């Protein structure tokens, strides 16, 4: 994983009251708590989830 492209994603807004599909995207990225940061592979699938809930996230990479 050290040579694969990754993206750092941080959940900055609450999932309370959000659409179930948006909550599922956050869970799919491995995010459970506010201010939790995870590093995910830069794949089209992960990029799609990041784009869908970009208003809840801060990401770099």
UniProtKB/Swiss-Prot annotation:
Record keywords, A-Z: Ribonucleoprotein, Ribosomal protein
Entry annotated with the keyword Cytoplasm: no
SUPFAM superfamilies attached to this UniProt entry: Ribosomal protein L30p/L7e
Origin: domain of life: Bacteria
Subunit structure: Part of the 50S ribosomal subunit.
GO BP: translation
InterPro entries, sorted: Ribo_uL30_ferredoxin-like_sf, Ribosomal_uL30_bac-type, Ribosomal_uL30_ferredoxin-like
Protein's organism: Chromobacterium violaceum (strain ATCC 12472 / DSM 30191 / JCM 1249 / CCUG 213 / NBRC 12614 / NCIMB 9131 / NCTC 9757 / MK)
Name this protein carries in UniProt: Large ribosomal subunit protein uL30
Family: Belongs to the universal ribosomal protein uL30 family.
GO molecular function: structural constituent of ribosome
Pfam families: Ribosomal_L30
A GO CC term attached to the entry: cytosolic large ribosomal subunit
